[in-house]
């Protein structure tokens, strides 16, 4: 598609930013929900004059020949369809935000709205009415048409809008996503083999899930799985991969959910570093330290430490180990 414009998708971080802004502004008792379009691409018609160019060819086993079918709506997954739909979704979102004053975001055919509990009915009416006026259909299935709530799911994660002591709210992976990932890890461990395609898929899904779990455990797992992506056939897992997958499994089950703070506490920055010079023959000289700086760049606290030769040997003489110590 030739275009000079780029459509910016509003994902999990944008929804989190919206919630944080409302909490910071003093808006309490927030609830949220997601509105999902029914068969989204099929709701966008192709211009009648352009339909002769929109033809799908399918082999007919009865007539034993290829037949062409003219499309009346956007074909799902086609590049032009995606771009055109994203423009439509962005326009709908702009109507909700600018004209209706709704705290709203959009991601493909999912529209997330966050509002006060007392305004939830009017917000629901505003969204459904605007879609009716535009001639677009929202999903009415029980699985997707879920009312406003303190805890709601959007884009594969769960937003918990209970205001915690310390002024923060939580974002975690949905139970369904956790169960699915645990099942896939168990399958890989049981088979003790993985193909490049399987490794790439698992790595991608673990990368998304890890963003909602506190800690850096996943980084090592993702790096290790990347080594298998070039393999066409299934290859045997090495011992390190099995260990990392088991650690990741426990991290998914019991890892602390992502916390987003919205309080007015002062911002501080912590800078840490380590150094290592010399060699084993002449002796190693090491150092490490940290600096605590306020939001204006003023140093609040700092420390430095020079490890002994024995200390350096304990960490194996590796600079990356020293850099982690502060």
Q: PLM features: what roles do these ranges have?
A:
Residues 33-37, 266-281:
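Two-metal-ion RNase H-like nuclease active-site motif
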């Amino acid at each position: 598609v030739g275009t000079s414009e780029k459509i910016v998708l509003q994902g999990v971080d944008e929804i989190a930013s919206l919630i944080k802004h409302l909490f910071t502004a003093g808006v309490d008792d927030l609830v949220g929900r997601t509105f999902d379009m029914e068969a989204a691409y099929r709701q966008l018609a192709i211009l009648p004059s352009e339909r002769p160019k929109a033809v799908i060819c399918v082999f007919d086993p009865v007539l034993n020949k290829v037949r062409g079918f003219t499309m009346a709506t956007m074909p799902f997954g086609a590049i032009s369809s995606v771009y055109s739909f994203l423009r439509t979704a962005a326009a709908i979102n702009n109507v909700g935000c600018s004209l209706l004053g709704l705290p709203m975001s959009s991601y493909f055919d999912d529209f997330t709205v966050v509002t006060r509990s007392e305004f939830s009915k009017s917000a629901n009416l505003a969204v459904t009415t605007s879609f009716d006026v535009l001639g677009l259909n929202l999903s009415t299935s029980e699985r997707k048409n879920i009312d406003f709530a303190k805890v709601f799911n959007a884009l594969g994660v769960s937003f918990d809008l209970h205001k915690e002591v310390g002024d923060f709210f939580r974002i975690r992976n949905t139970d369904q996503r956790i169960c699915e990932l645990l099942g896939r890890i168990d399958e890989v461990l049981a088979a003790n083999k993985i193909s490049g395609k399987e490794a790439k898929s698992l790595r991608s899904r673990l990368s998304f899930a890890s963003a909602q779990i506190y800690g850096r455990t996943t980084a090592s797992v993702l790096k290790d799985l990347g080594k298998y992506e070039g393999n066409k056939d299934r290859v045997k897992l090495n011992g390190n991969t099995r260990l990392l997958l088991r650690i990741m499994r426990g991290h998914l089950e019991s890892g602390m959910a992502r916390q987003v703070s919205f309080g007015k506490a002062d911002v501080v920055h912590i800078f840490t570093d380590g150094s290592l010079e010399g060699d084993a023959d002449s002796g190693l000289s090491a150092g490490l330290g940290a600096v605590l700086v306020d939001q204006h760049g003023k140093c609040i606290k700092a420390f430095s430490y020079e490890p002994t030769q024995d200390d350096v040997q304990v960490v194996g003489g590796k600079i990356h180990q020293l850099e982690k110590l502060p």
